[in-house]
Amino acid sequence: MKKQRKILWRKGIHLAFSEKWNTGFGGFKKFYFHQHLCILKAKLGRPITRNRQLRHFQGGKKALQIQKTWVKDEPPCAKTKFSVDTPHASTLSSPVKRKDTKHFVSSSRTLLRLQAEKLLSSAKNSDHEYCREKNLLKTVTDFPSNSALGQANGHRPRTDPQASDFPMKFNGESQSPGESGAIVITLSNHKRKGFCYGCCRGPEHHRNGGPLIPKQFQLNRHRRIKLSPLMMYEKLSMIRFRYRILRSQHFRTKSKVCKLRKAQRSWVQKVTGDHQETLRENGEGGSGSPFPSPEPKDPSCRQQPYFPDMDSNAVVKGTNSHVPDGHTKGSPFLGKELSLDEAFPDQQNGSATHAWDQSSCASPKWECTELIHDIPLPEHHSNTMFVSETEKEIATLGQENRTSSLSDDGVKLSVSGADTSVSSVDGPVSQKAVHSENSYQMEEDGSLKQNILSSELLDHPYCKSPLEAPLVCSGLKLENQVGGGKDSQKASPVDDEQLSVCLSGFLDEVMKKYGSLVPLSEKEVLGRLKDVFNEDFSNRKPFINREITNYRARHQKCNFRIFYNKHMLDMDDLATLDGQNWLNDQVINMYGELIMDAVPDKVHFFNSFFHRQLVTKGYNGVKRWTKKVDLFKKSLLLIPIHLEVHWSLITVTLSNRIISFYDSQGIHFKFCVENIRKYLLTEAREKNRPEFLQGWQTAVTKCIPQQKNDSDCGVFVLQYCKCLALEQPFQFSQEDMPRVRKRIYKELCECRLMD
């Protein structure tokens, strides 16, 4: 352990001396404290005889100061070399020699110091040069200790700066009085990582004629920084924090994804880029070679395509050249991927004619194949065949007697009965031909960049992605693909006035029968109008809805009541069935009466106040409620339970003596079931039915439809009762509640159950 500490101690000393870790930051304020202590004691003139390590620092103090003042090699512009006397070198290096220190000053650095001194001594012949250099040296030495020059590179300020403490280099060392120049002072760090902090301007130009340019501040960012554990640097935590972020898996994954996205080009960029490369290859391949010549890297050296003006047809060998049948298989153009060359026009008398491959069909015909040698090429004629290829698919477009005229403004392609703009698979092409001295030159950077993404070209199928491209190869028409389309519907012979009168009469009938438009559905309105006019009015729903809204505004209040047996419902009771309202006791009780009357011999429906009366007053409070009814002759008893804000249902199956609990929220109130069981036992003793005094069981039904809101519990209870009474399965859910509400409204108004 002691040996390990000693090794770390020495590493810390070496790191503090070398200052590698200080590159790129400001002056370090806190570094190895022993070194700081030694230098401070040395400046104060106090002897340091603490221990062996401190003596080592005392001996290396001067070496550290000299090491901080190392300079770069002489710049290339320095022409003069000086000879050095050995006595001076020995005198300079003698103060540095100590017992426990190393020689940090080499002969080359001593030579540089002597060169600066000899430069000053040789300049005394010229008063102008001497004064200028003396003033410059004075300016450098008089810099304050906290200036940018003294603080640069992390050097600590010195107490007594002298001219000898600043290693300097001078560009333009020996000049005659008549010559002019500029002096560059270079203050360099150790290991020849020099930095030029300024240029002391003399005249405008150097004596050799070249302009004087100050050196730029350069920092090797790829240089690794090895940190010692004994180092106390105030920015170390920030370095570690940023390093952890950069090395995190999320950051690296995100950066990789961003690089991949940047590297991938969009489909339009690929199209335009491939076409620009094609234009360059076509322009350079005019020498008759089947393969395009390599493109120069310098864009200024690119040759523009040249079109010869000849009375005869100009045939250029390429992918679109005319090859007789039988020679296609031996074509040198077969490969994995071929580039599309623009069809060269046949030029006659200063005009060019673009024509397509003539075929028997009048409409454009697309033939898709996988290999190029499977496409039959027509014989050579005056027209030019247009061949387009994308990887393994080759399409041949033929059009009969279609020409395009080439003028000074551009190339216009007109095709009747087809798209007005025609482009190749590799991308849209916009050309501008300029006629000058029997030649046509194509401007690549001008019109191509301006019109390459025009609206007309982007509308073309080949400017869209492959997923959005129409199915042209299969010959399918895109017109009226979905159901013939509603756009082709004929104008309705029924005007708005007739429709409004018929609709108003139908709404009057609904209001008279139900007291409101709550049970009315859209399907019923459209069905009624179709029966009257024998026409579908689905396309006129906005007008119908507007008429219904106006009708409701005119008939807001209606004196409507329903009487059934001992029950009476007014509009306030029926309004609970509208929207998300809670059902009240009147609606529950009257609907239970309808269920009981639908199957009078099997089902008995208790009033919603029965359970509350039983809990508050006991059996004597409800004894008279079943005075005229023998409960034990029924098959099913339906008992609604209303607990403040929630509706539940208890059923009693007398055949097997089972008491069941139904709740649309999955709640089980055991005390309610126990109260009903005690009531049945008491009722059996009162009616002298000993067979029902024992064998009762309770059950909780869970696999039933559940509500998904807080307002439809009463509707679920009524639907449970109806399905159990009519022995129907539970085939409803929360989505059916609006329809169930309308149906219950109608059943209450018509005083009968509907299937």
Curated annotation (Swiss-Prot):
Spell out the residue ranges making up region: Disordered.
Answer: 269-329
- In this chain, the stretch annotated as Protease covers 563-724
Per the record, GO CC terms?
Answer: nucleolus
Q: Which domain of life is it from?
A: Eukaryota
Active-site residues annotated for this sequence? 646, 663, 713
Q: Where in the cell is it found?
A: Nucleus, Nucleolus
| Gene Ontology terms describing biological process | cell division; protein desumoylation; proteolysis
Q: Which Pfam families match?
A: Peptidase_C48, SENP3_5_N
Q: What class of enzyme is it?
A: hydrolase
The answer to keyword tRNA processing applying to this record is no
Q: What Gene3D superfamilies does this protein's entry cite?
A: Adenoviral Proteinase, Chain A
Enzyme Commission (EC) number: 3.4.22.-
Task: Keywords in alphabetical order, please.
Answer: Cell cycle, Cell division, Hydrolase, Nucleus, Protease, Thiol protease, Ubl conjugation pathway
Q: Which GO terms describe its molecular function?
A: deSUMOylase activity
Positions with biased composition (Basic and acidic residues): 272-283
Q: Which family does it belong to?
A: Belongs to the peptidase C48 family.
Q: What does this protein do?
A: Protease that catalyzes two essential functions in the SUMO pathway: processing of full-length SUMO3 to its mature form and deconjugation of SUMO2 and SUMO3 from targeted proteins. Has weak proteolytic activity against full-length SUMO1 or SUMO1 conjugates. Required for cell division.
> Subunit comment for this entry?
Interacts with CCAR2.
Name of this protein:
Sentrin-specific protease 5
State the taxonomy lineage. Eukaryota, Metazoa, Chordata, Craniata, Vertebrata
Q: Which gene encodes it?
A: SENP5
